[in-house]
Amino acid sequence: MNLSEHLRERNCPVCGSTARSTILHPANFNEAHLDEFAFASRKLPELMHLDLVRCPICTVVYASPAFTPEFLCSAYGGAAYDSNEEAYFAARTYASGIPLTPNRSDALEVGTGNGAFLIELKKAGFKNVCGVEPSSAASNTAQPQIREFIRPGMFRAGDFAPASVDLLACFQTMEHLEDPRELCASTLQLLKPGGAIYLITHDYDSWVTRLLGRKSPIFDVEHLQLFSKSSLRYLLESCGFERVEIRTIRNRYPLSYWFRLAPLPRAAKRLLNRVLAGTRIGRIPLSLNIGNLAVTGYKSSLR
């Protein structure tokens, strides 16, 4: 596959600015090194990315040219999946920050994976839950009692009625969207008055990124934009959300997963993971601040 055939120039995906700054990080991806996990979640970091520029208006770092929506639909639909255990760890972490809304009736998750967070939503009292997931490999690993709540395919706002959702959650997915602003604007229409959007994203300005530079796992060929607190606030407030709150979180995963993210040679990580997989040490959970942000915003209760 020639990936260059599926790339197109774009304006800033957050503010729409046509202003062009110089390339911040030149593309360094080698198509020959991409495999079936290239568009999978929680994979071994490849440390490859597209041309990245910073918007001089809203400060988001974004890829241009970037993959077309048609290519992304195909790529994510056929992506492999091998992070079932980590998904449950992440879901429990994110469940602790579920926003308070007037009602806990209807919740929607975009990019639900194996549906782990849908289970947490049920525990939190939401009566009706729905997850949208393009990867059949991911959704096929869902627990039987939750699989019926997962819709296959890419998220399309038109599939849901306006003002029908109390909470829309979207975790580690905003970076992958060709048009993240469209998702936020659509969410505002789908939410009931007083409803909330709940996002988890990487933080381009985090201490981890400053320390590791382009060896940080957030530099990835599937990440079409990298947010910071300022660009996230700009995005949500300009889309009409109120009471926007952004905070740094601590992720909790088994020790073996943290080593998968470490800036070590891939061969060394594979060997280390095999060793840890055969011991109890690898299963020890550890909470770390690796530069992820939890973001919440509310639709006006008067709308």
Predicted regions mapped to residue ranges:
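Conserved N-terminal segment of class I S-adenosyl-L-methionine
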Residues: 1-171, 180-184, 248-249, 282, ...
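Membrane-proximal basic amphipathic "stem/tether" segments
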Residues: 1-6, 214-216, 253-300
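Conserved catalytic loop of SAM-dependent methyltransferase domains
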Residues: 25-32, 74, 244-269
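Short, glycine-/aromatic-enriched active-site segment of Class I SAM-dependent methyltransferases
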Residues: 26-36, 199-225, 230-236, 259
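Hydrophobic/aromatic residues located in beta-strands of well-ordered beta-sheets
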Residues: 129, 197-199
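Short catalytic micro-motifs in class I SAM-dependent methyltransferases
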Residues: 171-178, 222
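A short glycine-rich, Lys/Arg-flanked "PGG" loop and its adjoining helix->strand segment in the class I
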Residues: 181-196
